[in-house]
């Protein structure tokens, strides 16, 4: 049973290090750029809504 537990612990450590290695090189800039590219339609609609809101209601 001790051998099985040690192998299980090693697998957890391996997965944790892999996840960390994948996430560390990324910065907020590329992630934001990618999300903007995926959501351009939503962003355009939001901008139009904001402009129309300011024009009609005088929202601050």
UniProtKB/Swiss-Prot annotation:
<feature type="modified residue" description="2,3-didehydrobutyrine">
    <location>
        <position position="46"/>
    </location>
</feature>
<feature type="cross-link" description="Beta-methyllanthionine (Thr-Cys)">
    <location>
        <begin position="50"/>
        <end position="53"/>
    </location>
</feature>
<dbReference type="Pfam" id="PF08130">
    <property type="entry name" value="Antimicrobial18"/>
</dbReference>
<comment type="function">
    <text>Lanthionine-containing peptide antibiotic (lantibiotic) active on Gram-positive bacteria. The bactericidal activity of lantibiotics is based on depolarization of energized bacterial cytoplasmic membranes, initiated by the formation of aqueous transmembrane pores.</text>
</comment>
<keyword id="KW-0614">Plasmid</keyword>
<keyword id="KW-0883">Thioether bond</keyword>
<feature type="modified residue" description="2,3-didehydrobutyrine">
    <location>
        <position position="42"/>
    </location>
</feature>
<feature type="modified residue" description="2-oxobutanoic acid">
    <location>
        <position position="27"/>
    </location>
</feature>
<keyword id="KW-0425">Lantibiotic</keyword>
<feature type="region of interest" description="Disordered">
    <location>
        <begin position="1"/>
        <end position="29"/>
    </location>
</feature>
<feature type="cross-link" description="Lanthionine (Ser-Cys)">
    <location>
        <begin position="35"/>
        <end position="39"/>
    </location>
</feature>
<dbReference type="GO" id="GO:0042742">
    <property type="term" value="P:defense response to bacterium"/>
</dbReference>
<feature type="cross-link" description="Lanthionine (Ser-Cys)">
    <location>
        <begin position="52"/>
        <end position="59"/>
    </location>
</feature>
<keyword id="KW-0044">Antibiotic</keyword>
<keyword id="KW-0078">Bacteriocin</keyword>
<feature type="propeptide">
    <location>
        <begin position="1"/>
        <end position="26"/>
    </location>
</feature>
<dbReference type="GO" id="GO:0005102">
    <property type="term" value="F:signaling receptor binding"/>
</dbReference>
<comment type="similarity">
    <text>Belongs to the type A lantibiotic family.</text>
</comment>
<dbReference type="InterPro" id="IPR012519">
    <property type="entry name" value="Lantibiotic_typ-A_Pep5"/>
</dbReference>
<dbReference type="GO" id="GO:0031640">
    <property type="term" value="P:killing of cells of another organism"/>
</dbReference>
<protein>
    <recommendedName>
        <fullName>Lantibiotic Pep5</fullName>
    </recommendedName>
</protein>
<keyword id="KW-0929">Antimicrobial</keyword>
């Amino acid at each position: 049973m001790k051998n099985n537990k040690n192998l299980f612990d090693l697998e957890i450590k391996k997965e944790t290090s892999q996840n960390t290695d994948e996430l560390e090189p990324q910065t907020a800039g590329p992630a934001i750029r990618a999300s903007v590219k995926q959501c351009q339609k939503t962003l355009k609609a939001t901008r139009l809504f904001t402009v129309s809101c300011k024009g009609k209601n005088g929202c601050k």
